A protein has these predicted regions:
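C-terminal binding/interaction regions
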Residues: 14, 124, 129-131, 136-183
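Predominant activation on well-ordered alpha-helical scaffold segments within soluble catalytic domains
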Residues: 7, 11, 24-27, 31, ...
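Short polybasic/polar patches that bind polyanions
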Residues: 11, 31, 35, 74, ...
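Acidic/His-rich, divalent-metal-binding segments that scaffold phosphate/diphosphate chemistry
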Residues: 1-61
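Amphipathic, non-membrane alpha-helical segments in soluble helical-bundle scaffolds
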Residues: 16, 99-102, 162
Length: 183
């Protein structure tokens, strides 16, 4: 499945434009992580693009979340590597390879970085790791972001938090125009 088909599938399932923007931003971060790890950015990008495809339908039902989306992806002919990583996003037992472990900190750091971008006049342009690190310590900033998933990146994928921030910023900048995060 190429990206245009994948975006069309996402748009057919997502009920909110905010969901689509979230999926595209996580896609950008996953593509950047793939390049860093010498993996296929198209595969990793699709994992990011699809990871919350059922978010608007499952409405926080953690048992169904990702399982509904996995069913849609299988029906659309998406490969099991991608489907497994989508399941891994919400169900730990599926975290069996690097891409399925990477989606967890990638999702969390993307949400955090988007929050950082939204409070800056320049939005995603020119974000600095040091500023993000400082904001991470502020519990009142982006309180919905699971900071443990960000801090756990060293154990899960072998990256320090600063490195995850740096790669995440690059990934976010790569899709900033598409998701409205430019000044």
């Amino acid at each position: 499945m190429d990206r245009a088909e994948a975006v069309a599938l996402v748009r057919s399932k997502a009920e909110k434009e905010t969901t689509v923007r979230h999926l595209i931003t996580v896609e950008g971060v996953m593509r950047r992580l793939a390049v860093h790890f010498g993996e296929d950015p198209d595969t990793w990008g699709l994992v990011g693009l699809f990871h919350d495809i059922d978010q608007d339908q499952t409405h926080g039902d953690l048992e169904r979340h990702a399982r509904v989306g996995a069913g849609w992806l299988r029906e659309a002919g998406v490969g099991e590597t991608i489907v497994n990583a989508v399941l891994a996003h919400a169900h730990e037992q599926y975290r069996t390879d690097l891409v399925s472990r990477a989606i967890v900190p990638a999702d969390a750091v993307t949400g955090f970085l988007v929050a950082c971008a939204l409070v800056r006049p320049e939005k995603a342009s020119g974000m600095k790791v040091s500023s993000c690190r400082k904001k991470l310590k502020e519990r009142s900033f982006a309180p919905g972001v699971n900071r443990d998933e960000i801090r756990g990146c060293e154990a899960s994928i072998g990256l320090g938090v600063d490195e995850l921030f740096a790669l995440g910023i690059e990934g976010l900048e790569s899709v900033a125009d598409e998701v409205g995060l430019t000044a």
